[in-house]
Amino acid sequence: MERVQPWLAPFTWAMVTAQNAMLCAAKNALHKPTSDGHAVTEDLWENRHHESMSLDEAVDLCRCCHRMAPFCLYNGNTFSSIIALVIRKLDLPPTEGQIVRSLAGHIVAGVASDEEERAFREFCASLS
C-alpha cells in the first residue's frame, strides 16, 4: 500500500454533506450549514480532498474541517466516519483495524492523548 495517495478523493463535498445529513437524521437532529464555517470548510475540502497525501495528513485535514464547524451538529462524527471508511479500505486484521479507526477518530475529534497520536503516527509511518 502506498503511503502517499489520494485517500480522501472519493469523498466530494456533496458526500460529506450527505454523511452529516444521515447522522443528523438518525438522531432527529437539525442538519443545517453554519453561516461562519460552511463556505470556508467547503472551499478547503474541495481544494484539498483529491490531493495525494499521507494518511496522517488526511486525518489532519478531517480534524481541521471538524474544527471549522461547517454544520450545526455532528461535525466530529461526520469527519471521523469519513476517515474510518478510508481506514476500512486498508483491509487490516479486525482488531488492528478497530484500533487504528479508533485512534484516527480520536485525533479527528480532538480528544486523542499524546500517546494515541504517537501510536497513530507510528502506524502511518509503517505503511509502505
Language-model segments: which ranges?
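FIC/Doc superfamily catalytic core
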Residues: 1-128
